[in-house]
Amino acid sequence: MLIDKDSKLLRANGKEIAVKDVKENMFLIQNELANNVHVKLNDFTYTGYLYTITTANREYKLFSGTHVLTSQGYLSIEKIYSLNTKLDLMLLVTRNTDYGIMSTYFASNRIFAVEREVVEDYECYKVSNVQLVVDSLICVDNS
């Protein structure tokens, strides 16, 4: 899934999908691009959109607006942005703890090249050299 910033189209699996312009050199990847999924974690079922981020060494399942269990805890991807570089992503991330939802670094910040930035009052992290792809998984049951 690649962003063509000139035509503002997102190409995935041979399909071209328009991308909403958020601000200069930044395009919001809309939720409709990913599959609507129901995710069951710890007796709670969330409805959201499933993404997979792949690198040369790792693969991460991410759920927009819901939570995914990782070795770092439960993470919520609030929004996914693409910068003007085709394979750079900016992730807005929170961690679900016993004390509620709190901002945190992306769990893979020791794996990717991550730079902290602030966009629209959110803590954001630029994750380099990754590719965002839509996954076809229907349901994850972690119980």
Where do the language-model regions lie?
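Autoprocessing domains of the Hint superfamily
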Residues: M1-S143
